[in-house]
Every structure is written in structure tokens, then in C-alpha cells.
């Protein structure tokens, strides 16, 4: 099928797609392009071109709409109920067509519990052992290996992504715990009783996906006892550090968010991203504070 005048595109919806026989046949002959839901910039551009009331909406208004779902198909939907129904269909399709057949599990209830638990702890470092102990203490019989297998299945289906911990001094990976993020924060609406709770971690989820979209490998940083939300590593092994907070107008909150970045001794770029509209573009001894929505719309290079 190889011809000079033919470009062949093969699409798939999970990480299993290029495994096994197909990968053997295509080895060395393909370029894999990872596609995520819409970025905030793409979402805004669509509304500029198609939504006549866009001029009346602030970036914050658009962000509220964006967090309902960033799947392209939802742009054509006229009600939140329609979007909700679509997200339910997407979630069910992923679980019953991708995850459950691949894991070959009959315990769908436990798998669902693990998925919902990961959604509820978005942005919080969590270990497999802690997840297992949480379920066991609530009366659910589940093993470490089962939890591990379920999480791997949820990640292979591209429903969840993870960020491992990275020790900044010494540049080594830590195996203790990871953070997990949903492919679309709108899925929280069908997985959790209060999807709008914890807006700070929802923002963190959005920033994580944008870093992946921009081509970075993303880790959670550790400096002594302090956590850095993201260490973004480019293809040349250059680092950029990010702290993400909903707001830092309170001096105590600002100091707390700056402290981990201040503990870093190297000269790589450091950013504090918030939804603050006052005091943006401040610089704290090399730590640049930016409005997170401006950063999402910022055409920066890797």
C-alpha cells in the first residue's frame, strides 16, 4: 500500500491500538500523533468564529464553559443536559468497549469505584497502596495488584493520565506516589456527586493537559518537603517549573505557593499560574506570576 502519492492515516482510541501484530507490521514506518480534546485557545477560537455573543463573554466566562467539556463534539450542543448525556455515552463507551474487555474483569463495580476515586483525588499525590487500603477500610475486598491493573487499564484507555514524582535535586524519579488527571474535566460531572468542588485541582488538570499538548513530559516536583505542581521537561531535557493556584490575593497564600519554587536553585523558568486578575505579570525574584487563562492562550514555544 506504500505509494509516493499516498498518505495513510490510521486512527485509534486507546494505547492498545499500536500493540501486538499491528505494531510489528508498522514498525519504523509510522509517526504516532497523540490527539487530545480541544485546548482553551481552540475552544475560544471556535466561539469567535461561530458564536455571535462571544464579545459579551470574558475569558473567565469561556473558561467556565470550557470546563463543562472540551470534547469537540460538545461545541454543537445547545444545552448542558445534552452535553451531560454525551459525556455519559463517552464514558460508558470507553469503559465497556475498551477497559473492561481489555482487563477481562467481571468485577465492574470495583473498577468503577477505582475510576471514580481517581477522579475525586485529581491533583493529589496518591499511591496504589493507599488506594487499596482506602477501599479495604470501607469494606471493599481488593488487592494491590488488582488496583494496579485497573489503573493501568484506565490509563491505557486514555481516560486518565498520570504524573510521576520527580526529585529536582538529583533529577531522579520517585516511586512513592503519582498524580492522576482526567482527559476532560467535564467527565467529573458524571463521575462525582459534586463536580464543581475543588476548582483549584480542576485548573491544575487543565494546565497539565495543556503541557502535554505542548509536547512536554510532565512530572510532579519534589524539593525537600515541598511539592512543585509540575516539572515540564522538553525534548532537549530543559525544565520549566509551574505552581498552579486558584487565587493568591491573600499574602499568606501567595507566600505558600511561591515557597516551593523559591527552594529551587537552578536557573530554569519558574511560573506561578492563577486565576487572579489583579497583580498578574508580577515577578518575584525570577518567578513569573501569570493569569492562567492568559497562559493557556499564550503561543509559547517548547
Positions of the model-derived regions?
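Accessory nucleic acid-recognition modules appended to NTPase machines
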Residues: 79-238
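Loop/turn-to-beta-strand initiation segments
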Residues: 4-9
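Switch/connector loops and helix/strand junctions flanking conserved nucleotide-binding motifs
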Residues: 16-21, 41-44, 251-252, 279-283, ...
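Domain-level recognition of nuclease-like catalytic cores that cleave nucleotide substrates
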Residues: 277-302
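Nucleic-acid nuclease catalytic cores
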Residues: 223, 265-284
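Active-site ExK catalytic segment of metal-dependent nucleases
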Residues: 240-249
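Interdomain motor-coupling "hinge/lid" segment immediately C-terminal to the ATP-binding subdomain
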Residues: 13-15, 19-125, 158
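Active-site-adjacent loop/helix micro-motif of nuclease/hydrolase catalytic cores
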Residues: 248-259
